[in-house]
Each structure stands twice: as C-alpha cells, then as structure tokens.
Amino acid sequence: MKYVVIVGDGMADYPVESINGKTPLMVARTPNMDWLAKHGSLGLVRTVPEGFNPGSEIANLSIFGYNPLQYYTGRGPLEAASLGVELKKDDLAFRCNLVTLHSQGSKVVMEDFAAGHISDAEAHEIIAYLEQEMGTEEIRFYSGLSYRHLLVMKNGGSVCSGLERLGLTPPHDIIGQEIAPFLPENKDSGRRILTLMTESQRFLKEHPVNLDRKAKGLRPANSIWLWGQGRSPQMVTLKERFGIDGYVISAVHLIKGIGLLAGLEVLQVPGITGYFDTNYEGKGEYALRGLEKKDFVYVHVEAPDEAGHMGDLRLKVEAIEVFDEKVVGTILKGIKDFEKVKVMLLPDHPTPLSVRTHTAEPVPFVIYSNETGEKKHTADTFDEVSALKSGLFIEKGYELIERFLIRNPGSHE
C-alpha cells in the first residue's frame, strides 16, 4: 500500500460576508478535492488540542500522529532538526523571525511578521551579520529561509530555567498591534530576550540590506522576534510505529523538522519557496516519484496560510485553486499507476481572513482508498460545512494517522 498525506496549510476559514457567508474553500474551484470528497470518507478533526496555541507545529505534530501533550517542547527545536542543528540536552532553540516594527507616536507596532517576505539572499546576509556582531559561545544564529530563522542558546535550559517556560507570543498573532503588551517582563529570563531583540534593532537600523529595501519602498527587517523556544524532543519514528519509510516535501523548516524527527527523508524539490510563487506542480510530481521508491509521502503547501495572514480573500481563493489543480490534481492523476493507494487531505488549522492568524477549530479532512469495500462518508464538496454534515468527527487529531494507516477510514470506533 502507498500512502500520501496532502496538507493545505491554513485553508480552513470562517464564513465571509462578502461572498454570501461562504468560506474560501466553498467558493474556490476545487474539482480534485471535491472528487476525493465524493469517493472517500469526509469528516472533521481537531488537530489542536484544547489549551494549546493553534500553531502549525501543534497541528502538524497531530497530523503526523504525535500527541502534542507528550511530544511538543517548542517550535524552535523542530526547526533546528530541519537545519541540521544538533541540540544538546540543555540547549534551547528559539524561532527567530525577521520582522518589521513601526513607530506610531509613542507606540511600536508589529507592522509585518515576515519583513515584507524578505528574500533568502537578503535574510542570509542579515543573519550572518547578526551572528558576527551578536553571536557568542552561548548565543548562535542560524539562517533559514526568508523571514524564518533560528537562535540557539547553549545550555539555556540549565543556566536560566525560566527561559524554557517564558511565554513568548508568535509575531503573526499580533499583526498591526502594539508590541508592548506582548513583550516579556524586563527581569530575569525575560530581560535576556528583551536585550537580544533590542540589540538587534540597533544593528539592523542602518544595515545595507535594509537601506536598499527602504529605497525600493520595501519593508525593512528592522528587528528580530524570538519565540517558540524548547529543547529537542524525543520522538518514536513512523517506521518504529507503523513499519513505513517515506519522505516529507515542504519549503517550511518546521514541517521538514517534524518529518526528520519522525524518521522521514526530506525530498528536495527545486523552486519551492513557502510562498505564492512556489513550484506547486513540482511538489506533486516529486511526491509521485517518492511513492515509486517508498511507501509514504507527506506533502505540505504553505500558500493558503500566507493569504490568510494577509487577510486577502482573492489571494486565498487563488492559492486554494492552484493547490487543487497543480498539487492535488497532479497526485490524483499519477496514483492511478499504483495498485493500492490511500490519500489523506486536510488543512492543518484554520487561518481565517477576518483575524489574520491561526485558530483552533476542527478542520475538514478526507481519506480516500482505491480499494473497494471500505465504508465511506461521502459528500459532493470538500469544505467545512460538508465535513460538519458528515457526522464523522475525530476529537484526538493525533489518532487520525492510525485511522489512515491502519483502520477503515469510515468507521466510528
């Protein structure tokens, strides 16, 4: 049996008044996802357990089959795995965003959590500069992609125990808001984080990359923002649990990191960016190549989530339609060559246009198998309303992978 998981990041949404109370999934043209709904088993799944922040790290851990309560230690260490950064027992890894802060009178506002989606080359130059100017034996900067980077604090978990438990807000949760209420207190462990972020602003203010960006009318990367800290998690691999080998396909270090910790191999696809200009078709084509060699492929596409964060309805509908045509469509066409195959498709979490950040509501999922005789919960369309009407609901999202890999997808037990 061959298995494909396809994740459209942040596709789910709330009803939008301007499109007659429908969601982007409902108005987008998605013949391939709708085909899966008609021939598979449709339902709702809670990927974010109650009490957890609805981050992609939590939701994708659940989809991969890992209970966040047991395995989640922070977003930073998951991204460290993708970057090949080895963490020792007491090392703390922080997600390090390049952001754009803007002064409005006496207030400082989070203008852009992604620094205008700064290019990889520009970001690499900035992170290398910060490592040169701010890096020490204790503090190390590692370059990722675009605005997504890593800061590792050596022995941070033992030198200052409060750092690990410090509540740090993801910058995409506070777009357009004053940052002061979301900064850690200026004492003990919080002071160390404040000092690093403030110091970065001094170094970045007149950096050549930012001067050039401002001259072009682009948003500068004028600060770092630290969050998502934690130690390296100890995870049982999918091969140990289910006896399968496979690949993960994503431009996002977080997803690749989870895949690596789950024992998968990263399948490198040329031209993937984690943005609207990604190589959608290449992801589908490489997923099929992966299935020729191994049993399992996890395909992740970031674009719908980015549109949600921007609050742009047109872009979100377009991203969903391109995802359906070039990723889902390519995979559905190619899997006809395999004798036995199962497909699971879902968003990881909603990223509603009205709030421009992640939320924790259950999301629609569909499981399709080309084997006959499996009980199904079918519908005409793949969307939030059809999934709700199906009557199939998975409360513990991390159990969905077992339903996909082991059990009949339509059963309620």
Model-based region annotation:
Residues M1-E413:
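Feature captures the catalytic ectodomains and active-site-proximal regions of enzymes
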